């Protein structure tokens, strides 16, 4: 420790002080999981010193192997470490709560005024930007995950399976996990994770939860606590599901949304982009809660709001409730809002369960190849699945009338420019979407003047 680094830990943090920090974070957590984790690292490790870098990375590596939004889980994990279950619930909920209300408002504007020429023009430019963002996501995941020919082969097989044969996403995840498990036993060097997020390399001074701080009693694994959390978690899930079933029946959209997004929450290995193909298969093709175009627009809204990207499910729920007119044509906003709340509840409940129930168990298997090699296989498959999602988006953006219709040259140019900005010039996602939306609006305004 250098002379510029504090030798004493900061004073204990009250639950109220922590509450206001998590509340503020929920409004500024832009930039996807990478940006959100960077914000928390700067605030909690470097500035406030609530937790040491080593303990921060230790928690992050746990969250990375769980299904669900890792930044949300990291917030819940740190909140739980500091202030027990109450702290975890507060931290995790406030991380996505602002974006929930923002997306409900934006979804209402979209459904009520989406056909207004100015709004349609902005969306015309945003759609190819979203396609470029998904392609870039596949590139980023692939560059990190595909370290050898075996993993490249898994990614290619996953792409062919979903693109050519329309294999459901859960089967692809299951097959990739089995291949990863067997591969870890046969060729462990091909399925090693490479150390997750690495070891701590810097010391910012003594922290409240420091490297040598003992694990607090509430974070230690006991079978009694495990059983209590498990029973309560099942009750929270089954209680709401039973209420929906008793009130509306199994075939009602709200009940189906609860069941579908529970399954989706358990399949989000690799982040939100990984689960989007599954959500597309269910939301667009199977249940027809929204159209392909609406899903692209929803992803754009999700990219431009704070909170985890998986909050796009809130938009899907709102649009599904609105279009199905669940409570009649006079209550479209109410129907959309209730559906959005149902979807969000069932999407995020498993994340809290994994933290409160699974963190002590995951700690015992952290770094064990038998545990991590299936995740390596799944991550490789995710690359192929996300690339298929990009192809799906590109088809609907560039050939809106199908291959028999005209090719849209302007969206192609906008999409290429957006990808170049992301890849070559490291431009942020929000500026890219804003610029592409402005280009689409400008085109819409000048098109009538040009007589096109």
Where are these regions (language model features)?
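Multi-pass membrane proteins that catalyze or facilitate reactions on polyprenyl-/lipid-phosphate substrates
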Residues: 1-66, 77-305, 309-452
């Amino acid at each position: 420790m250098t002379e510029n680094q504090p030798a004493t830990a900061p004073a204990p943090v009250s639950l109220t002080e922590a509450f206001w920090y998590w509340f503020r974070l929920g409004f500024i957590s832009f930039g996807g999981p990478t940006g959100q984790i960077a914000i928390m690292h700067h605030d909690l490790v470097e500035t406030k010193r609530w937790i040491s870098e080593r303990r921060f990375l230790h928690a992050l590596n746990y969250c990375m192997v769980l299904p669900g939004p890792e930044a949300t889980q990291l917030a819940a994990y740190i909140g739980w470490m500091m202030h027990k279950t109450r702290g975890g619930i507060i931290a995790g909920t406030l991380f996505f709560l602002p974006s929930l209300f923002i997306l409900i408002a934006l979804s209402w504007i979209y459904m009520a005024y989406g056909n207004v020429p100015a709004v349609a023009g902005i969306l015309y430019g945003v759609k190819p930007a979203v396609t470029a963002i998904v392609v870039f996501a596949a590139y980023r995941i692939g560059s990190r995950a595909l370290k050898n020919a075996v993993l490249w082969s898994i990614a290619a097989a996953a792409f062919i399976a979903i693109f050519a044969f329309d294999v459901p996403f859960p089967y692809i995840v299951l097959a990739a996990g089995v291949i990863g498990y067997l591969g870890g036993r046969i060729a462990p060097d091909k399925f090693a994770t490479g150390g997750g997020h690495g070891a701590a390399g810097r010391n910012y001074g003594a922290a409240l939860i420091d490297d040598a701080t003992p694990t607090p009693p509430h974070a230690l694994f006991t079978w009694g606590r495990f059983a209590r959390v498990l029973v309560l978690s099942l009750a929270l899930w089954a209680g709401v599901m039973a209420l929906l079933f008793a009130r509306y029946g199994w075939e009602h959209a709200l009940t189906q949304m609860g069941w579908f997004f529970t399954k989706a929450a358990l399949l989000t290995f690799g982040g939100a982009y990984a689960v989007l193909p599954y959500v597309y298969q269910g939301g667009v093709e199977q249940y027809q809660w929204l159209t392909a175009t609406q899903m692209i627009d929803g992803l754009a809204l999700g990219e431009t709001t704070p909170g985890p990207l998986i909050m796009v499910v809130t938009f899907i729920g709102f649009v599904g409730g609105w279009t199905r007119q669940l409570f009649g044509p006079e209550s479209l906003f109410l129907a959309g809002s209730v559906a959005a709340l149902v979807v969000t509840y069932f999407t995020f409940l498993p994340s809290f369960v994994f933290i409160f129930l699974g963190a002590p168990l995951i700690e015992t298997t952290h770094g064990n190849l038998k545990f991590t090699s299936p995740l390596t296989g799944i991550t490789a498959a995710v690359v192929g699945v996300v690339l298929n999602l990009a192809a799906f988006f590109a088809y609907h953006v560039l050939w809106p009338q199908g291959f028999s219709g005209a090719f849209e040259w302007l969206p192609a140019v906008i999409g290429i420019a957006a990808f170049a900005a992301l890849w070559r010039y490291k431009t942020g996602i929000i500026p890219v979407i804003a610029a592409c939306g402005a280009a689409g609006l400008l085109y819409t305004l000048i098109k009538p003047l040009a007589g096109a």
